[in-house]
């Protein structure tokens, strides 16, 4: 079977789970459960919602101190349980009881570890506003999370990885950034969820429906810029303290937005590629083959086939050789040679279009125009982005433009989503702390 992998897919969290009580039943989830909760001892946790590609609505528990990020499952309307790993329900390690105030909305959580003392955390005041962002002729549907209290507040725009992702595709990050005192803007990607338009990103490949003159990532950058302008025009927001965070493709895009918008306050690249897109695809071919356990002889075959189809796409030569090699792979039951892109090309014209308008894109030249502080985080064990190469390339490109406020870190045992491998029970150590400390110095936020 051909392995299908969306390039730079979202956060890469292991969303598949065993059968569970349906959290979408009436009364099981209400929006008042989502938010930031603070204990009297300074312990801060978040409850976020996530909607999977299949439309399932899931709930995440995040402990910003320990790094635990796991799915929780309903026992009753206001009692939920968390198991020992991301998707496991049993044996239960934590029981979460939502406490309601006089109006019936959630005002806090009671946390009952199976082995440990109980604690209570009060829900932090937070304004949640549905918004519409104009981007050219399109309309992006989103949500603005505003801190309570007098502004103007520093703010952050969250940018998606590739794929049909919505404002609920950011895992623990919306409320994590909110817990730091930032206003947070999240939105449905163009052509996804409630946003209008057609989605074009690194995962869509060569599309005949692309508008004339389209080049990747034009529309993504247009939407990121529109989100920035939207925040800049809000009276609650400090226009001099608006920055970007993105994961995967969104991490790359955060740096491009900072290059375009000279008044951006900061940019955070989480696992984003830094180099030509074709180079990242070629890296993925070998890394994913090894991750699937293929022997090195087969990894070599994968890389040779990857080099072949990319050469054909770049030069237009030897298309017949590519078709013959692909047909042979299918005939010989070697579908492991193919990925979703090389397996789906139907013509040389399509391959050439993909190269000229998407695969040849290189984010590095624009980085010489970035003047704001930049943070880059990559996972040591990421099979989708070459972490050492990306970190080095980003540092060098920014330095060439004279940017001296550049921080890069490769997270030990981190995955593409920066979850800790091998079991993905939590964010890898250092992720939340690094973001928090770095932003305190650059975004003017106080201690929670």
What are the residue ranges of the model-derived segments?
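N-terminal cap/lid segment of alpha/beta-hydrolase-fold proteins
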Residues: 112-150
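Conserved alpha/beta-hydrolase
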Residues: 178-198
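Short beta-strand element of the alpha/beta-hydrolase
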Residues: 152-161
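Primarily recognizes the serine-hydrolase "nucleophile elbow" in alpha/beta-hydrolase
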Residues: 226-291
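The serine-hydrolase catalytic nucleophile loop
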Residues: 163-175, 189
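Short beta-strand/loop motif that positions the catalytic acidic residue
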Residues: 370, 376-378
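Accessory cap/linker subdomain of secreted extracellular hydrolases
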Residues: 201, 268-369
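Alpha/beta-hydrolase active-site loop
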Residues: 206-235
């Amino acid at each position: 079977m051909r392995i299908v992998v969306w390039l730079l897919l979202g956060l890469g969290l292991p969303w598949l789970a065993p059968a569970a009580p349906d959290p979408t039943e009436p009364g099981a989830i209400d929006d008042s459960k989502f938010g930031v909760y603070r204990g009297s001892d300074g312990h801060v946790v978040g409850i976020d919602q996530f909607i999977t590609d299949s439309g399932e609505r899931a709930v995440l528990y995040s402990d910003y101190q320990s790094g635990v990020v796991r799915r929780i499952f309903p026992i009753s309307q206001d009692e939920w349980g968390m198991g020992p790993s991301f998707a496991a329900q049993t044996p239960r390690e934590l029981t979460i009881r939502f406490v309601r105030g006089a109006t019936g909305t959630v005002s806090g959580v009671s946390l009952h570890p199976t082995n440990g003392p109980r604690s209570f955390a009060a829900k932090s005041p937070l304004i949640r506003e549905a918004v519409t962002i104009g981007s050219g002729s399109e309309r992006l549907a989103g949500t603005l999370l505003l801190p309570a209290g007098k502004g103007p507040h520093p703010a952050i725009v969250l940018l998606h990885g590739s794929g049909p992702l919505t404002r609920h595709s950011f895992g623990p990050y919306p409320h994590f950034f909110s817990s730091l005192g930032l206003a947070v803007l999240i939105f449905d990607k163009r052509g996804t969820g409630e946003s209008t338009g057609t989605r074009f990103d690194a995962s869509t490949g060569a599309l005949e429906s692309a508008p004339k003159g389209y080049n990747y990532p034009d529309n993504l950058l247009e939407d990121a810029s529109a989100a920035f302008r939207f925040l800049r025009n809000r009276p609650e927001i400090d226009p001099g303290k608006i920055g970007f965070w993105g994961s995967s493709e969104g991490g790359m895009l955060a740096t491009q937005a900072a290059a375009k918008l000279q008044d951006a306050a900061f940019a955070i690249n989480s696992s984003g590629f830094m180099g030509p897109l074709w180079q990242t695809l070629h890296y993925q071919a070998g890394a994913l083959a090894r991750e699937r356990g293929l022997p090195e002889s087969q990894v070599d075959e994968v890389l040779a086939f990857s080099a072949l189809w990319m050469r054909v796409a770049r030069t237009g030569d030897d298309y017949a050789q590519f078709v013959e090699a692909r047909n042979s792979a299918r005939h010989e039951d070697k579908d492991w040679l193919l990925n979703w892109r090389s397996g789906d090309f139907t013509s040389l014209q399509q391959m050439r279009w993909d190269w000229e308008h998407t695969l040849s894109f290189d984010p590095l030249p624009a980085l010489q125009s970035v003047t704001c502080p930049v943070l880059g985080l990559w996972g040591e064990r990421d099979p989708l982005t070459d972490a050492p190469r990306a970190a080095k390339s980003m540092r060098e490109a920014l330095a060439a433009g004279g940017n001296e406020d550049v921080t890069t870190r490769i997270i030990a045992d981190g995955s593409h989503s920066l979850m800790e491998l091998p079991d993905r029970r939590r964010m890898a150590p250092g992720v939340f702390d690094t973001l928090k400390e770095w932003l305190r110095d650059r975004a003017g936020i106080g201690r929670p």
